[in-house]
Design a protein with these regions (language model features):
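Active-site-proximal cap/lid insertion segments
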Residues: 1-125, 129-139, 182-189, 197-203, ...
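Short, well-structured alpha-helical segments that form the helix of a local strand-helix-strand
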Residues: 143-146, 217
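Basic phosphate/pyrophosphate-binding loop/patch that engages nucleotide-derived ligands
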Residues: 149-156
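WW-domain-binding short linear motifs
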Residues: 158-162
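Residues that act as N-cap/strand-start positions at coil-to-secondary-structure junctions
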Residues: 165-167
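Short, surface-exposed beta-strand/loop micro-motifs that present aromatic residues
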Residues: 169-175, 179-184
């Protein structure tokens, strides 16, 4: 199954071909069938781990590298794939970068445990390295093993920085509950400021209400960006 290719699901008869998905074989019913098929495969993997007697000491992670997309005929609006969050894949709004993350380790992590710790994919390498007690490594990531094991002593990022070169170029930076976006950089650039704690759907741009916070995050964003000739982002970089 390749999420960015045309969807292929198992034909389960009336379960998907009638009723709930507008009776459309493609793409909606097919998408639903593919998700169902994926769920079945995960169940088969879990069953095999239990059969081998290694389930309790096996880590299973379920996540995504970005928000929902429209590739392959996907229809994220129909399935309300993002819930309240704005944006999809390639957007730096929460809908494009906030994803589900399930960390299953039955022998050490209590079922139903929930955490609001903010982490990112570059935290995975140091996390796995700490789990296997590997040699010290120098990365931008921070191990989330303390959070996984229920330890309150968890280091946090000072900020998280994102950028994307398509769609006119965009940047985003999150520091604590504040998030600044720099959008359409290469054409008609604009900034948007949100408090993610009180406005997770990013509806109310409060940039005019908090000029000092805007300046703080803008300066931090400029420092975080690194020029890369392969991925020019700012207008001045296309001249180099």
């Amino acid at each position: 199954m390749y999420p960015e290719k045309p969807y292929h699901g198992v034909d389960s008869g009336a379960l998907f071909r009638k009723g709930g998905y507008c009776s459309q074989v493609y793409p909606r019913a097919t998408f639903a069938a593919m998700v169902y098929r994926y769920d079945v495969y995960v169940g088969q993997i879990i069953a095999k781990l239990k059969e081998k007697g290694i389930y309790d000491n096996t880590i299973v992670i379920f996540t995504s590298d970005n928000g929902p997309h429209r590739e392959g005929g996907a229809d994220p609006e129909f399935f309300n794939s993002n819930g309240i969050y704005k944006g999809i894949k390639r957007d730096l709004y929460e809908g494009g970068i906030r994803v589900p993350f399930i960390f299953s380790w039955p022998g050490l992590v209590e079922e139903g445990t929930v955490s609001d710790h903010v982490c990112t994919f570059w935290d995975m390498m140091p996390t796995f390295n700490e789990i296997v007690k590997g040699q010290s490594i120098n990365t931008d990531g921070i191990s989330i093993l303390p959070t996984v094991l229920g330890n309150n002593i968890q280091k946090k990022h000072d900020y998280l920085y994102f950028e994307f070169h398509e769609q006119g170029g965009s940047q985003a930076i999150r520091k604590e509950n504040w998030k600044l976006l720099h959008l359409n950089i290469q054409q008609e650039a604009r900034y948007e400021l949100y408090n993610i704690a009180s406005d997770p759907a990013e509806i109310h741009n409060v940039i005019d209400l908090y000029p000092e916070k805007f300046d703080e995050l803008r300066i931090l964003m400029e420092k975080a960006h690194r020029y890369d000739a392969n991925w020019p982002l700012l207008p001045s970089e296309f001249m180099k």
